[in-house]
């Protein structure tokens, strides 16, 4: 069973995301809008991973579930993006145990309960 739903605006080919715990939106339904993604994640108890600030706002307004990992750094070369994610992912997963919203910046992580 997956634990994380990766939004369409993120690359699916990140090494640490290449296992059964992660599912990419385009493999479910590439036509889904944000509300469909939100409802699927909520129904299936998945954490949404996205750069889309709309999920950040929905999480603040609607609460959990689902939890949201919001990637809040600008466009990077793919290798740099992968490096940032791989360097912080273990901490992100630990923070998700007690937090509902995680903001990943290029140089820090912010966790909100």
Which ranges hold each PLM region?
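A general structural motif
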Residues: 1, 45, 65, 98-99
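N-terminal first-folded block
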Residues: 2-47
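Glycine-rich nucleotide phosphate-binding loop and flanking beta-alpha elements
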Residues: 12, 55-57, 110
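Structural signal for conserved beta-strand scaffold positions within catalytic alpha/beta enzyme cores
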Residues: 24-27, 70-72, 103, 111
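Nuclease catalytic cores that cleave nucleic-acid phosphodiester bonds
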Residues: 40, 56-80
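Acidic, metal-binding active-site segment of PIN/NYN-like and related structure-specific nucleases
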Residues: 45-59
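C-terminal structural segments of small proteins and small subunits
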Residues: 74-110
């Amino acid at each position: 069973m997956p634990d994380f739903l990766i939004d369409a605006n993120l690359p699916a080919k990140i090494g640490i995301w290449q296992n059964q715990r992660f599912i990419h939106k385009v493999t479910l339904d590439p036509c889904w809008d944000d509300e469909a993604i939100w409802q699927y994640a909520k129904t299936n108890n998945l954490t949404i991973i996205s750069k889309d600030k709309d999920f950040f706002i929905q999480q603040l307004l609607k609460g959990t579930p689902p939890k949201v990992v919001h990637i809040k750094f600008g466009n990077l070369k793919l290798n740099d993006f992968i490096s940032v994610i791989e360097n912080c992912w273990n901490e992100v997963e630990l923070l998700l145990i007690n937090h509902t919203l995680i903001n990943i910046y290029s140089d820090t992580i912010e966790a909100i309960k």
